[in-house]
């Protein structure tokens, strides 16, 4: 998350613009994006291996956003690719299914996209507007939100 009042204002203002752009870009119903930003680990790693083990890559394109794509060459096969954060915007816009672990983008999904937040330790109070000191920000950036019980 972006630290600092003015940085956060700029971040969310940019997100509003990109959210409007996102509405106009066609979605690929056969594309799954796993957004990690750092290494493929925890929930993202588990989801990735589950999808590959069960053959989802035969029907869907699976794109993983990681910090060092070259570390995952052994997992690359047809319809599976690893990309950097810098090259991820197009895939974020076009994927119907986006899974986020440990990061919240200021871009909102369209009605034609499903975005899942599957952090462990999800900050539910912040996301559900229960912490008023955060200001007038809209934190509803996911279609679904998971939480451990």
Question: Where are the regions that the model predicts?
Answer:
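Active-site and donor-binding regions of nucleotide-sugar-utilizing enzymes
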Residues: 33-149
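Membrane-proximal basic amphipathic "stem/tether" segments
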Residues: 1-32, 36
């Amino acid at each position: 998350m972006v630290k600092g009042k003015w940085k956060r204002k700029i971040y969310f203002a940019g997100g509003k613009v990109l959210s409007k752009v996102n509405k106009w870009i066609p979605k690929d119903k056969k594309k799954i994006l796993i957004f990690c930003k750092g290494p493929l680990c925890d929930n993202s790693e588990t989801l990735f291996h589950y999808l590959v083990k069960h053959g989802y890559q035969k029907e869907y394109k699976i794109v993983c956003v990681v910090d060092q794509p070259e570390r995952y060459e052994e997992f690359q096969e047809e319809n599976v690719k690893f990309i950097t954060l810098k090259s991820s915007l197009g895939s974020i816009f076009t994927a119907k299914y986006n899974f986020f672990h440990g990061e919240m983008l200021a871009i909102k999904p369209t009605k034609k996209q499903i975005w899942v937040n599957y952090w462990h330790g999800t900050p539910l109070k912040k996301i559900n507007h229960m912490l008023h000191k955060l200001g007038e920000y809209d934190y509803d950036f996911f279609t679904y939100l998971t939480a451990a019980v």
